Amino acid sequence: MLQVYLVRHGETLWNAARRIQGQSDSALTEKGEQQAYQVGQRVRDLGITHVIASDLGRTRRTAEIIADACGCSVVLDPRLRELNMGVLEQRKLDSLSAEEESWRKALVDGTENGRIPQGESMSEMAQRMRQALDACLSLPENSRPLIVSHGMALGVLVSTILGLPANAERRLRLRNCSISRVDHQQSPWLASGWVVETAGDVSHLEDTALDELQR
């Protein structure tokens, strides 16, 4: 049975400022770097063989810290990027006009073909995220990969594995540097294919998560 660990990147400057990141980028905060270090300490004895990350800076840096603890190198995969938020990227949430907020709401509420202008739909992201996960099936036998990606991207992946619509990710809290795990199994009794073992574990993190403070 293949086990794949899923980690959201550490806290960023734009997370703290409540600014829309999408496929734009901002650096990890000092707290974000510490969160990544705590993930590394949690997983270093789990036999991680591969660290695979979105090629955006915040995931790349998170992955580097974790990979150092595990004695692995980092492989970048652009399919693991966050949702392309189009013309709303880099904007603060409280600066959106009523029309712009309607675009965002249609997208995250699962309106059919909902997307932000110049952006990406949830279903398009779900497709590329599943492709990136399925690529782990081609790794050598006894591999144990760890993927570093983004909040919405990982939420969509976990939701669709469970047979839920992509926009169900809004009901799944994956905090910065949370750890999830999905397994690929073949079973005559249980569901075959990808199954969710855990989602959103933050027991390794020492401080209160930013989104808890901002609720």
Swiss-Prot record:
<feature type="binding site">
    <location>
        <begin position="8"/>
        <end position="15"/>
    </location>
    <ligand>
        <name>substrate</name>
    </ligand>
</feature>
<feature type="active site" description="Tele-phosphohistidine intermediate">
    <location>
        <position position="9"/>
    </location>
</feature>
<keyword id="KW-0413">Isomerase</keyword>
<dbReference type="InterPro" id="IPR023086">
    <property type="entry name" value="Phosphoglycerate_mutase_GpmB"/>
</dbReference>
<dbReference type="GO" id="GO:0016791">
    <property type="term" value="F:phosphatase activity"/>
</dbReference>
<feature type="binding site">
    <location>
        <begin position="151"/>
        <end position="152"/>
    </location>
    <ligand>
        <name>substrate</name>
    </ligand>
</feature>
<feature type="binding site">
    <location>
        <begin position="82"/>
        <end position="85"/>
    </location>
    <ligand>
        <name>substrate</name>
    </ligand>
</feature>
<dbReference type="InterPro" id="IPR013078">
    <property type="entry name" value="His_Pase_superF_clade-1"/>
</dbReference>
<feature type="binding site">
    <location>
        <position position="58"/>
    </location>
    <ligand>
        <name>substrate</name>
    </ligand>
</feature>
<feature type="binding site">
    <location>
        <position position="60"/>
    </location>
    <ligand>
        <name>substrate</name>
    </ligand>
</feature>
<feature type="binding site">
    <location>
        <begin position="21"/>
        <end position="22"/>
    </location>
    <ligand>
        <name>substrate</name>
    </ligand>
</feature>
<dbReference type="InterPro" id="IPR029033">
    <property type="entry name" value="His_PPase_superfam"/>
</dbReference>
<comment type="similarity">
    <text>Belongs to the phosphoglycerate mutase family. GpmB subfamily.</text>
</comment>
<dbReference type="GO" id="GO:0004619">
    <property type="term" value="F:phosphoglycerate mutase activity"/>
</dbReference>
<dbReference type="GO" id="GO:0006096">
    <property type="term" value="P:glycolytic process"/>
</dbReference>
<dbReference type="GO" id="GO:0005737">
    <property type="term" value="C:cytoplasm"/>
</dbReference>
<feature type="active site" description="Proton donor/acceptor">
    <location>
        <position position="82"/>
    </location>
</feature>
<dbReference type="InterPro" id="IPR050275">
    <property type="entry name" value="PGM_Phosphatase"/>
</dbReference>
<keyword id="KW-0324">Glycolysis</keyword>
<dbReference type="Pfam" id="PF00300">
    <property type="entry name" value="His_Phos_1"/>
</dbReference>
<comment type="pathway">
    <text>Carbohydrate degradation; glycolysis; pyruvate from D-glyceraldehyde 3-phosphate: step 3/5.</text>
</comment>
<protein>
    <recommendedName>
        <fullName>Probable phosphoglycerate mutase GpmB</fullName>
        <ecNumber>5.4.2.-</ecNumber>
    </recommendedName>
</protein>
<feature type="site" description="Transition state stabilizer">
    <location>
        <position position="150"/>
    </location>
</feature>
<dbReference type="InterPro" id="IPR001345">
    <property type="entry name" value="PG/BPGM_mutase_AS"/>
</dbReference>
